[in-house]
From Swiss-Prot:
One of its GO terms (cellular component) is cytoplasm. InterPro entries: Heat_shock_Hsp33, Heat_shock_Hsp33_C, Heat_shock_Hsp33_N. GO terms for molecular function: protein folding chaperone; unfolded protein binding. This is 33 kDa chaperonin. Keywords: Chaperone, Cytoplasm, Disulfide bond, Redox-active center, Zinc. Redox regulated molecular chaperone. Protects both thermally unfolding and oxidatively damaged proteins from irreversible aggregation. Plays an important role in the bacterial defense system toward oxidative stress. It holds the Pfam family HSP33. Disulfide bonds join 233-235, 266-269. It is found in: Cytoplasm. Belongs to the HSP33 family.
Length: 287
């Protein structure tokens, strides 16, 4: 079962979060039929969105979008406060080979921007954007948190893809210091992080999320919260129809005149919906 653990280093002002989301990323891989570079990129963005979701309040959502000039083009993951996540990659059939014995996600992403959109339950979304620093996702998220959110943060994300393309390990961790954090603790954590093995390696060794945090920081953790990560897409035919309404009466009339059923496929879960001409006529009368 995929999980997330959120806590504090005991007696210190340091927030720590870790997630293992191997099953979720493997489920997404199967839905989108991704090749290794696309799988690794999507998996990292999924893990990153879960880490950021740990800071949300009830019923809030967050979307992480990576938009680059590399062959992947766009990678998106959305997570809510219940750690329900969904994702897609614009070009799923991409494999760029290895770099330093790891899947070369940076070359697949290229140069571009990281966009974070927060749905806080208000009338408008809160959106911020930073330029990609490496395209490897983890450092880009850390840069976003440091620059846009003004929160000193360290982020590590990892996805291990087997030769048969299946996902053997996926997850990540995030460490955030606060203004009250002692300088000695910051320096200690910096040293520990420089010695830390990769996230995917720790998952492959059988560590759970709490054990990963304890391994990374080397200090006792006070657990604040545990949650379960699941892949979930809330799309419905009603939502499809509502989207068609936004096109306006003129566009709907054109669809009716063409006399063809409207076929819609959800980006996130690949579920297909059909809206018949008769349904379009009823819709036009109601708006």
């Amino acid at each position: 079962m995929d999980e997330v653990v959120k806590g504090l280093i005991k007696n210190e002002h340091v927030l720590v979060v870790a997630t293992i989301c191997t099953e979720t990323v493997e489920y997404a891989r199967k839905i989108h039929d991704t090749w290794p570079t696309a799988t690794a990129a999507m998996g990292r963005v999924i893990a990153g969105s879960v880490l950021l979701a740990s800071t949300l309040k009830d019923r809030q959502k967050i979307m992480v979008q990576i938009k680059g000039d590399g062959p992947l083009n766009e990678v998106v993951a959305e997570a809510d406060s219940f750690y329900r996540v969904r994702a897609y990659v614009k070009r799923p059939h991409i494999y760029m080979g290895l770099k330093n014995e790891k899947i070369d996600v940076g070359r697949g992403v290229g140069k571009g921007f990281l966009n974070v959109i927060r749905d806080l339950g208000l009338r408008e979304y809160y959106q911020s954007s930073v330029e990609l620093q490496t395209g490897e996702i983890a450092r880009d998220l850390a840069y976003y948190l440091n620059v846009s959110e003004q929160i000193p943060s360290a982020v590590s994300l990892g996805v291990y893809v087997e030769p048969d393309n299946s996902v053997k390990a996926a997850g990540g961790f995030m460490i955030q210091t606060m203004p009250e954090t002692r300088t000695e603790i910051v320096e200690f954590l910096e040293r520990k992080l420089s010695e830390t093995q990769s996230t995917s390696s720790m998952i492959l060794q059988g560590m759970d999320s709490l054990q990963i945090l304890e391994e990374v920081v080397g200090l006792p953790i006070e657990v604040l919260h545990r949650g379960t990560v699941t892949y979930f897409c809330p799309c419905t035919k009603d939502r499809v129809i509502n989207a068609i309404v936004t096109l306006g009466r003129e566009e709907i009339q054109k669809m009716i005149e063409e006399g063809k059923t409207v076929d819609v496929e959800c980006y996130f879960c690949k579920k297909k919906y059909e809206v018949t001409v008769e349904e379009l006529k009823i819709l036009l009368r109601e708006i």
